[in-house]
Amino acid sequence: MFLVASAFANSPAPEVTFVSPCECIGFHGKNRWVTKTDLTPVPSDKAAIQSVTPSQIYAWEGLGPDVELTAMTERMPSEQKWYALTGRIIDVKVEADGDIHIALSDATGNNVGTVSAEIPVGLKWCEIRQTVFGWTTQKFPFTVKTAHTIKMSKSAPQTIVNNQ
């Protein structure tokens, strides 16, 4: 058993190359693939989009510790809605699965909770990915094997305000 575990521990991590903000080679996202590939369009009725803050999302009940996340894990009811999220940018990372993760806290800084807005690879998300990479000093192409923090430019916004 130890030898098997040791052999897997020494396996090289797969690489993903970010060719451009919208194109990745070798991305290998698998957890919650159903959620990431959902083609539901943004509602045309802006009243259907609820404004929220990171602390409000942080207070929501999650899937629970006993739920195994797989490619087929369905979306929770709260994930089946569209939200206008306003928050202060804490961190921006790219993941080895090709996703961009933006860590956000409340813009006021007064409430507990940091949430991650995940932007997957795909044509549907290209415009948002271009905007996020536009806030950074990142040059293309680049390759990662693990999560990689992206350096923000001096002109990057400190707060994202979504006014629907």
Please identify what each model-predicted range represents.
Residues 1-6:
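Bacterial N-terminal signal peptides
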Residues 10-164:
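OB-fold and OB-like single-stranded nucleic-acid-recognition modules
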